[in-house]
Design a protein with these regions (language model features):
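Cysteine endopeptidase catalytic domains of the caspase/legumain-like
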Residues: 1-286
Length: 286
């Protein structure tokens, strides 16, 4: 297992508006990520200390994994261009006190930036029924993240500076669509989020008469799939370019065992989305 996830769902707020669906969202996304072979930690109705500890643990563990997913559902806001997720026990106060009482998502990205060669996906289904918009300096919705670390994708449930719908069923509208899209096999993450955006837009206009437009910022450098279904392969026949690529490195594999995957060739082969077998078997076929 080379994939790790931290899932947080905050619904039962003490001093700001309670939300119906984030706990359900977190339950469902955590369950799906487990099915997709992620090592999942799920935190429900978290206060600031809970959030800080779980994020710190997640970042420390990320060193041992290739891919990390952070999912948050609950209240969120921006102050002075920075994005914050809201703990369940927050008391509304002035701007400076609120900033130190919430978790700054920019800290998560800064912490992840020290891990080179990792893929980090942040999915933020927040900014619902925002209780902070009336306060001076508190803005509805999240702000754009500037210069995310290389290998990062940040997905918002709605456009910057806008609110998201909490949904008319057991999930927020965004997660309602996302949880099904994540299970579509062999769909690149960029195409998956495009699919989500179109469905969320269509449903929001139909149900609410107003468009919710999800958004992503990406610095990904490779292909990523949540769900991969290996395609049948004739081990005696493979793509000519891949064959030449592997043969040029044949000596590296002369002593390889059946369960060894080459760290250089495998991403190249997986990118074609059809050669999901050990490199050594391809070599033996030739």
């Amino acid at each position: 297992m080379d994939r790790i996830a931290l899932v947080i769902g905050n619904s039962d707020y003490s001093n700001v508006g309670k939300l119906n669906n984030p706990k359900n969202d977190a339950d469902d996304i955590a369950s799906i990520l487990n099915k997709l072979n992620f090592d999942v930690t799920k935190i429900m109705d978290a206060n600031l200390i809970d959030i800080q500890k779980s994020v710190n643990d997640f970042l420390q563990a990320l060193d041992e994994y290739a891919v990390g997913v952070f999912f948050y559902a609950g209240h969120g806001m921006q102050i002075d261009g920075k994005n914050f997720i809201v703990p369940i026990d927050l008391k509304l106060s002035d701007k400076s006190k609120t900033m130190v009482s919430c978790y700054c998502l920019n800290s998560l990205l800064e912490g992840a930036s020290s891990y080179k060669g990792k893929t980090l996906i942040c999915i933020l289904d927040a900014c619902r029924d925002n209780p902070f918009a009336m306060g001076r300096g508190f803005l509805t919705g999240f702000a754009p993240f500037n210069n995310p670390p290389k290998g990062t994708m940040i997905a918002y449930s709605t456009s910057a500076d806008c609110s998201a719908f909490d949904g008319q069923c057991s999930n927020g509208l965004y997660t309602q669509v996302l949880k099904d899209a994540m299970l579509i096999p062999n769909l690149k993450i960029e195409e998956m989020f495009k699919f989500v955006r179109n469905k969320v837009s269509e449903i929001s206009i139909s149900q609410y008469g107003e468009e919710q437009l999800s958004w992503e910022y990406s610095s990904l450098v490779g292909d990523f799939y949540f769900s991969v279904t290996p395609q049948p392969v004739n081990e005696q026949v493979t793509d000519e370019k891949i064959y030449e690529f592997i043969c040029a490195r044949r000596k590296s594999y002369e002593n390889a065992s059946d369960n060894i995957y080459d760290i250089e060739c495998l991403p190249y082969i997986d990118a074609y989305n059809k050669y999901h077998i050990p490199i050594i078997k391809i070599l033996r076929a030739y």
